[in-house]
């Protein structure tokens, strides 16, 4: 599509869709809890729909309306074998979490996905789940999808040292551990988003955490709950960056999740000199309104334990860095290479095509700013965050037309993205 996006400031208020990570987990926990779960604010997107449909195939009754989703929980013992392989589409979260869950069930399940998901390594979940006693098989040494899981109701508790920082791998182990007799311990390489741990407690379960060590004793029984899901800070990040880099912009993003394991971008913006403020804090739902406006920014270094707190925001942060004075260095982010696409390679290629001074590194990039960007033809590469990064970059282009191919990838996490963009341009 040709991006008919006019340069000019963004102004007004916007509410981003429900948090994608929490939405997946809310559906799963509502299904394995006993009794009714009511969810408000669930993200209605392609990825989350994959999890919802898969749970229905596992025998769970889920009713959807405009305002809420109601799940009649089956408990762990109430899940049933699906009558066909489960289609995960583009959703690595769906596959990894459901594989962990179904490792504790006594029936076989096959998972498959689209071309992008079929290139994403699943060895990271295969190894610990096999150690617990499940039979898990993928394709080749990296265990690419399709994946077959033959679980067991007699899994063994393990002590597992995580070789990489991954909330999805951690969550897969914890979902299996909830069904496993004895104490399972997980030692994280770096602290990652803790939505699974929070949700275990919300649903009446017990989990113990001290720094990077997590302990869980199973088996456990969970009880249905009422949940309200805040807006996704990873989606809000696109408006945060747009407001910071487009002169005259000032926007407020309402009801955004501010779980401390996810707010790396807020800390980063402050470090770079950006004008950002939080109001209307809700400590129960861990949400707030984020106010952000155009700012003169300076380059910085992003590395170490900051990376897991903003891993999904790094494509749009790279665009932000092109508009900051000085050098920005991103290190320790090699996980970007196994996302929906190789985000290090793709971000470097696209921003360089637009005129940015960016150098690709094994584990990140080096970006020198500030640079003026120009129009080009770009592809989303089946990656929603790449598609939205290109759309925000188009706001900076003063001449020519930006063309984005594969914009439908944005449906993965933010179906009303272009509608919200138009609203902020005409507020």
Curated annotation (Swiss-Prot):
3-phosphoshikimate binds at residues 20-21, 25, 166, 168, 312, 339. It is found in: Cytoplasm. Pathway: Metabolic intermediate biosynthesis; chorismate biosynthesis; chorismate from D-erythrose 4-phosphate and phosphoenolpyruvate: step 6/7. The keyword Transferase applies. Keywords: Amino-acid biosynthesis, Aromatic amino acid biosynthesis, Cytoplasm, Transferase. GO terms for molecular function: 3-phosphoshikimate 1-carboxyvinyltransferase activity. GO terms for cellular component: cytoplasm. SUPFAM superfamilies: EPT/RTPC-like. It is an enzyme of class 2 (transferase). It holds the Pfam family EPSP_synthase. Phosphoenolpyruvate binds at residues 20, 92, 120, 168, 343, 385. The keyword Cytoplasm applies. The active site is at 312 (proton acceptor). Monomer. This is 3-phosphoshikimate 1-carboxyvinyltransferase.
């Amino acid at each position: 599509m040709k991006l008919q996006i006019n340069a000019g400031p963004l102004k007004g208020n916007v509410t981003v869709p429900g948090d994608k990570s929490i939405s997946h987990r809310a559906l799963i926990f509502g299904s394995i809890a006993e009794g009714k779960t009511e969810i408000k604010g669930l993200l209605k997107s392609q990825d989350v729909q994959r999890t919802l449909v898969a749970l229905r195939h596992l025998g769970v009754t889920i009713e959807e309306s405009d305002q809420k989703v109601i799940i009649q929980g089956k408990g762990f013992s109430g899940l049933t074998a699906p009558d066909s392989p489960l289609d995960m589409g583009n959703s690595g979260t769906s596959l990894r979490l459901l594989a962990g869950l179904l490792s504790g069930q006594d029936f076989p399940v096959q998972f498959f996905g689209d071309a992008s998901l079929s290139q994403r390594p699943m060895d990271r979940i295969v190894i610990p789940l096999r150690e617990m006693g499940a039979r898990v098989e993928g394709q080749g040494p990296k265990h690419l999808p399709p994946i077959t899981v033959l679980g067991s109701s007699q899994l063994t508790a393990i002590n597992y040292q995580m070789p990489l920082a991954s909330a999805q791998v951690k969550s897969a182990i914890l979902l299996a551990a909830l069904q496993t007799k004895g104490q399972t311990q997980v030692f994280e390489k770096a602290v990652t988003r803790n939505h699974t741990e929070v949700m275990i407690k919300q649903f009446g379960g017990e989990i113990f955490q001290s720094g990077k060590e997590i302990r869980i004793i199973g088996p456990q029984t969970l009880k249905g709950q009422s949940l309200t899901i805040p807006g996704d800070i990873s989606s809000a990040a696109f408006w945060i960056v747009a407001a910071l880099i487009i002169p005259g912009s000032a926007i407020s993003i309402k009801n955004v999740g501010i779980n401390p394991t996810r707010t790396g971008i807020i800390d980063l913006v402050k470090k770079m000199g950006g004008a950002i403020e939080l109001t209307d804090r809700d400590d129960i739902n861990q949400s707030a309104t984020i106010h952000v406006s155009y700012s003169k920014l300076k380059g910085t270094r992003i590395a170490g334990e900051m990376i897991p707190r903003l891993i999904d925001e790094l494509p749009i942060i790279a665009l932000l860095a092109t508009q900051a004075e000085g050098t920005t260095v991103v290190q320790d982010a090699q996980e970007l290479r196994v996302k929906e696409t190789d985000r290090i390679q793709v971000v470097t290629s696209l921003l360089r095509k637009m005129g940015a001074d960016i150098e690709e590194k094994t584990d990140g990039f080096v970006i020198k700013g500030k640079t003026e960007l120009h129009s080009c033809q770009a592809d989303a590469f089946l990656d929603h965050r790449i598609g939205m990064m290109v759309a925000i970059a188009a706001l900076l282009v003063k001449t020519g037309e930006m063309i984005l191919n594969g914009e439908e990838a944005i449906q993965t996490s933010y179906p009303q993205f272009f509608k919200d963009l138009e609203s902020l341009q005409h507020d």
